[in-house]
Amino acid sequence: MDYSEIMVRHGELSTKGKNRMRFINKLKNNIQDVLAPFPAITVRSDRDRTHVYLNGTDYQPVVEALKLVFGVQALSPVYKLEKSVPLLVTAVQDIMTSLYRDGLTFKIATKRSDHAFELDSRELNSLLGGAVFEVLPNIQAQMKHPDVTLKVEIRDEAAYISYEEIKGAGGLPVGTSGKGMLMLSGGIDSPVAGYLALKRGLDIEVVHFASPPYTSPGALAKAQDLTRRLTRFGGNIQFIEVPFTEIQEEIKNKAPEAYLMTLTRRFMMRITDAIREQRKGLVIVNGESLGQVASQTLESMQAINAVTSTPIIRPVVTMDKLEIIEMAQAIDTFDISIQPFEDCCTIFAPDRPKTNPKLGNAEKYEERFDIDGLVQRAVSGIVVTEITPEIVNDEVENLIDALL
């Protein structure tokens, strides 16, 4: 027997009341996006669960993809068959025979929503359990914590059998909590921040600052590859490349060295906020961790935040670097993040950046710039690319390999 579908159980969606179907429909759309590399698959959702019909597709890579999708509490590969007692008996015997080993314990757990079926749940449990003993006389039944719980569901349209329950990612479906702009540099922290924002249902668009020729095509490809890794958790992501060369050169030429980083981050925040407003986002997300570097002291954050009234979410702000690294390794972004390409935050980094910059000083130094013009030119020059879970070709990876 081959699995016919993966049955997905919803997570926190059960608490969403009148908005429940909106959340479920969004989860369905996200699952369809993530499973786009499997063209034979179809997806259907109802109030209780989502059905991923395999239609001949190997179930294992599908399970691996679904395990990462936020909003999924658990999933089970399922056999679908006609509602016939003889067919159920044969299926249960075949499945348990394939799983059997010495000392294995089991139980049958039947659920019947089709009350017109000839046997009730209790009778089915007894009948199917007896059928297992017929072919495996040495197997042991155990009602609490058995090795195998064989779940049988009798529904209006068919019967379903499963024995695996695989833990999902939990959280909320991406897109159910609004849209935010993720400032992604290419380092270790910002992809982790993006992952945690996605987990709470935030639909992120990635904002990446590029300063050619100071930053290379490899740095851009690296940021896009990190974004692609994040698509596994909720579907396609818009990648927004911002031209930042003019601004960085202006800051380098006109500002004191100690304030280079503060002014750079203030311009980045202004531009991200302008893009957010243009694209109807609600928040800005970044990977700042308190005290980790000079620009992430409270004084620096205050001086940088002053350019916007938009809420700024910092998911990793209280995490140690080792905690962030462990999470980056778990979500498979760490090895990409440590590839040796310069980004906008490092190319003109001063030897002794100001750790307690004064807002008044930052504003005074900015009087030397045409702030509105610089921001407007950067925003008008953005390039937007849709990043999908499916790598259509290997151009990005080949480019990175060639540059390393």
From Swiss-Prot:
Pathway the protein contributes to: Cofactor biosynthesis; thiamine diphosphate biosynthesis
GO cellular component, one term: cytosol
Alphabetized Pfam families for the sequence: ThiI (PF02568), ThiI_fer (PF22025), THUMP (PF02926)
Family matches, as SUPFAM superfamilies: Adenine nucleotide alpha hydrolases-like, THUMP domain-like
SMART domains listed in its UniProt record: THUMP
Binding site for ATP: M183, L184, H208, F209, R265, G287, Q296
InterPro entries membership: Rossmann-like_a/b/a_fold, ThiI_AANH, ThiI_fer, ThiI_N, THUMP_dom, THUMP_ThiI, tRNA_STrfase, tRNA_sulfurtransferase_ThiI
Any one Gene Ontology molecular-function term assigned to this protein's record: CCA tRNA nucleotidyltransferase activity
EC number: 2.8.1.4
Reactions listed under catalytic activity: [ThiI sulfur-carrier protein]-S-sulfanyl-L-cysteine + a uridine in tRNA + 2 reduced [2Fe-2S]-[ferredoxin] + ATP + H(+) = [ThiI sulfur-carrier protein]-L-cysteine + a 4-thiouridine in tRNA + 2 oxidized [2Fe-2S]-[ferredoxin] + AMP + diphosphate; [ThiS sulfur-carrier protein]-C-terminal Gly-Gly-AMP + S-sulfanyl-L-cysteinyl-[cysteine desulfurase] + AH2 = [ThiS sulfur-carrier protein]-C-terminal-Gly-aminoethanethioate + L-cysteinyl-[cysteine desulfurase] + A + AMP + 2 H(+)
Family from the record: Belongs to the ThiI family.
Protein name, per record: Probable tRNA sulfurtransferase
Organism for this UniProt entry: Streptococcus pyogenes serotype M6 (strain ATCC BAA-946 / MGAS10394)
